[in-house]
UniProtKB/Swiss-Prot annotation:
InterPro entries: Asp/Glu-ADT_sf_sub_c, GatC. It is an enzyme of class 6 (ligase). It holds the Pfam family GatC. It comes from Ralstonia pickettii (strain 12J). SUPFAM superfamilies: Glu-tRNAGln amidotransferase C subunit (SSF141000). Belongs to the GatC family. The lineage of its organism: Bacteria, Pseudomonadati, Pseudomonadota, Betaproteobacteria, Burkholderiales. This is Aspartyl/glutamyl-tRNA(Asn/Gln) amidotransferase subunit C. GO terms for biological process: glutaminyl-tRNAGln biosynthesis via transamidation; regulation of translational fidelity; translation.
């Protein structure tokens, strides 16, 4: 997938970001390099390879000692949302900024 300069300008416009021609060209180059890297990674055959939580597991003889995934704080969402101008179903409501 390769982007064109018009794509970068359109994305910048939608995000309400002002970019110069030079910045747009530099961003285009960086994005296309990134997409090229992603395509290379997707081309690798990974069938039969077990996913890792972290690559350090491959070089350390001992697995990482991770803490239990447990709630350690009380749910204070209602307290935090009392001062919000608008909430709904536990979510903060904000004005629409992108059409």
């Amino acid at each position: 997938m390769a982007l064109e300069l018009s794509d970068v300008k359109r994305i910048a416009h939608l995000a309400r970001i002002e970019v110069s021609e030079g910045e747009a060209a530099q961003t285009l180059t960086q994005l296309n390099q990134f997409f090229s890297l992603v395509e290379q990674m997707q081309a690798v055959d990974t069938t039969g390879i077990e996913p890792m939580a972290h690559p350090i597991e491959q070089v350390q003889a001992q697995a990482q000692r991770l803490r239990d995934d447990a709630v350690t704080e009380a749910d204070r969402r209602a307290d935090y949302q009392q001062c919000a101008p608008a909430t709904e179903a536990g979510l903060y409501l904000v004005p629409k900024v992108i059409e």
